[in-house]
Regions:
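Feature activates predominantly on carbohydrate-active enzymes
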Residues: 1-85, 89-92, 98-102, 107-109
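Active-site cleft segment of glycoside hydrolase catalytic domains centered on the general acid/base Glu
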Residues: 110-115
């Protein structure tokens, strides 16, 4: 099945979960099926992949995934780890899986900033 949708992968202010859920609603209304969560300003999926989001964020993300799943929208997480930080990457993947996100992209853009 083709994946057609949006990538949240830009620099700038992070979107709220209300905004993300509105996008999921729009995707569903337009027969699209994919949302990649990969904002450049989220340090917990990039430079500080070894740290966890807040419990409140995790609860909101879990609800976001549930909402998307009900609308047949696949949520994927784009992770941009330090190139040698495999343990933290594995832990982050497991954390996202526990929140209902089971699809991932490993991104290597901007990794030179991690020195």
């Amino acid at each position: 099945m083709k994946k057609l949708g949006v990538v949240e992968g830009f620099y700038g202010s992070l979107m709220s979960f209300s905004q993300r859920n509105s996008i999921v609603e729009s995707l569903s209304n337009n027969n699209l099926n994919f949302y990649l969560y990969a904002p450049k300003e989220d340090p917990f999926i990039r430079k500080h992949i070894d740290l966890d989001h807040s419990k409140e964020w995790e609860e909101q993300f879990q609800n976001f995934c549930h909402n998307a799943n009900e609308k047949h929208i696949q949520i994927s997480a784009g992770l941009c780890p330090k190139t040698n930080d495999y343990g933290s990457l594995a832990n982050k993947i497991n954390k996202f899986k526990s929140l209902g996100c089971n699809h991932f992209a490993i991104l290597f853009d901007d990794t030179e900033d991690y020195d």
